[in-house]
A protein has these predicted regions:
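Hydrophobic transmembrane alpha-helices and their helix-loop junctions in integral membrane proteins
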Residues: 65-74, 96-108, 120-377, 381-412
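Transmembrane helix-loop-helix hairpins at membrane boundaries of multipass inner-membrane proteins
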Residues: 1-89, 176, 457-463
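Alpha-helical transmembrane segments
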Residues: 14-24, 60, 92-96, 195-197, ...
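Membrane-entry segments of alpha-helical transmembrane domains in multi-pass membrane proteins
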Residues: 47-58, 100-112
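Hydrophobic alpha-helical membrane-insertion segments
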Residues: 16-26, 144-156, 360, 437-451
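Short phosphate-coordinating micro-motif centered on Lys-Gly-acidic
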Residues: 115
Length: 466
């Protein structure tokens, strides 16, 4: 249905505010790079270092792109006024909670914020009000709530260990205080705490075998929400794991590294081989997210170079996957199906959308000149340099499987005859321009890694080293 003028004004106002948020995130990145200390406020309760600034930039950037492509932004998008209103309220709350999670120094507030992302996003998933979307929302809510409860148990264990060794200290739940006390904490208890934390936040991050909610939720949610969940929500959950790894590494040496490596390899195997049998393109993109979050987890276990590759991969994946899901939403609106077999002749029916969707998928399989090729190459190199050549071999095998599967599915969608009843042609509007800009970003990150980005990634790695 056509969107009222008032709704479009509100929509573009939201986009403008998101542009301001992106500018603020860029300022934070610059302040972290140019300053001698992290940006702090409220006596250290809010603390933005390089890692926080990097995630904040990803969150605001993806949210801004999603806002341009959101319901109520013009034309006939199939949403009524009530759906548009609910989407805007809860998506903005969702983005706010992600920002709170990565900018607070308090592990308790971070836990609350990540739990709040579950609630705010679960309301948006069934926006289409279909049986499948409602079921996916409940599945997501229940599984992730159990995971968050386990993360809470791990947080409580770590806090009790801290109190038993350091006593009652102001700001005891702040990262800086925990890291300072970590060498004197009990290794056995911290191992148990991190196991709970990894399973808990790993559920939210989509790490296998806790990933079972992800394909349903990402495939049933509206395209902008799918883009935000896959592009940055998984990264926020990994942020929590990485922060705790920085504490546990000072207490229990290589325990966290080994767990992350195991979880990453399992996720990579499950994600890549699941791509072979997919029949729906949104579920295909969802399982691709499991694969890529596995690569990030592996990189975090491969020393400084691996961590650099992992954070670069998070950035690349945020851009590529959000772009892919937003384009998938355009395809769904035109073809009225998510079945790969029923989407043919995409390049003829939607030349711009088809070309950009092809670029997004080629980026996700790690082909040059896109940025994911660089991060995956660095990850494999890190595995070899750390003496884990078998890890490099497994990664290359899984990347090959993912490449063949995704290219096969993509070819079936791009070519062939346009189905009867599908309109041919599309207008070039702001949405296409915005998505094309995402492709440009991926090419820039693949050809020439800008010096400020490289410096921010280096600073991010140094924040987490013992």
């Amino acid at each position: 249905m056509l969107v009222p003028r008032r709704a479009r004004v509100v929509g573009w106002s939201t986009v403008l505010l998101n542009v301001v948020s992106v500018a603020d995130s860029v300022w934070l990145c610059g302040a972290v790079l140019l300053g001698d200390a992290p940006v702090t406020a409220a006596q250290g309760f809010w603390r933005v270092d390089a890692l926080s600034a990097l995630l904040a930039l990803c969150i605001t950037g993806v949210t801004c792109v999603a806002a341009v492509c959101a319901p109520g932004m013009g034309g006939s998008d199939g949403y009524d006024a009530r759906q548009v209103r609910r989407f805007r309220i809860f998506v903005n709350a969702f983005a706010l909670m992600m920002l709170v999670a990565v900018t607070t120094s308090n592990v308790g507030i971070m836990w609350v914020a990540i739990e709040a992302t579950t609630i705010t996003s679960a309301v948006v998933i069934p926006l289409h009000r279909t049986r499948a979307s409602v079921e996916a929302s409940w599945k997501y809510l229940l599984i992730c709530s159990v995971g968050i409860a386990l993360a809470f148990a791990g947080t409580v264990l770590a806090y009790f260990d801290f109190v038993s060794t350091a006593g009652q200290v102001p700001n005891a739940l702040n990262w800086t205080v925990l890291r300072a006390a970590a060498p004197s904490m009990h290794p056995e208890l911290m191992r148990l705490a991190f196991a709970f934390i990894l399973v808990g936040y790993g559920t939210k991050a989509g790490l296998a075998p806790m990933h079972t909610w992800l394909p349903d939720a990402h495939s049933e949610a509206p395209a902008p929400m799918s883009a935000m969940m896959s592009g940055v929500l998984l990264a926020v959950a990994m942020y929590a794991i990485v922060r705790w790894k920085g504490v546990v590494d000072l207490t229990a040496a290589s325990f966290a590294t080994n767990l992350l490596l195991a979880a990453g390899l399992l996720s990579l195997l499950v994600g890549s081989f699941s791509l072979v049998i997919q029949r729906r393109y949104k579920r295909m993109l969802a399982y691709s997210s499991v694969e890529h979050i596995g690569l990030v987890s592996i990189g975090l276990a491969l020393g400084p170079l691996g961590m650099f590759a992992a954070f670069l991969h998070l950035v690349n994946h945020a851009v590529a996957k959000s772009m892919a899901f937003l384009l998938a939403g355009r395809i769904l609106h035109r073809y009225d199906t998510t079945e790969i077999a029923r989407v043919t002749g995409l390049l003829r029916a939607m030349p711009w959308t088809g070309s950009l969707f092809a670029a997004a998928v080629l980026a996700l399989v790690g082909l040059p000149p896109f940025g994911l090729f660089v991060s995956e190459f660095l990850l494999v190199r890190a595995a070899v340099l750390t003496g884990r050549t078998w890890v490099a071999a497994v990664v290359l095998l899984c990347l090959l499987v993912a490449f063949v599967s995704l290219i096969n599915h993509l070819n079936r969608m791009l070519y062939g005859a346009v189905p009867e009843g599908v309109k041919v042609g599309e207008a070039r509007g702001w949405k296409i321009v915005t998505l094309a800009a995402c492709a440009v970003v991926l090419v820039v990150l693949g050809l020439v890694l800008p010096r400020p980005v490289s410096a921010l990634l280096d600073r991010t790695v140094s924040v987490l080293l013992p």
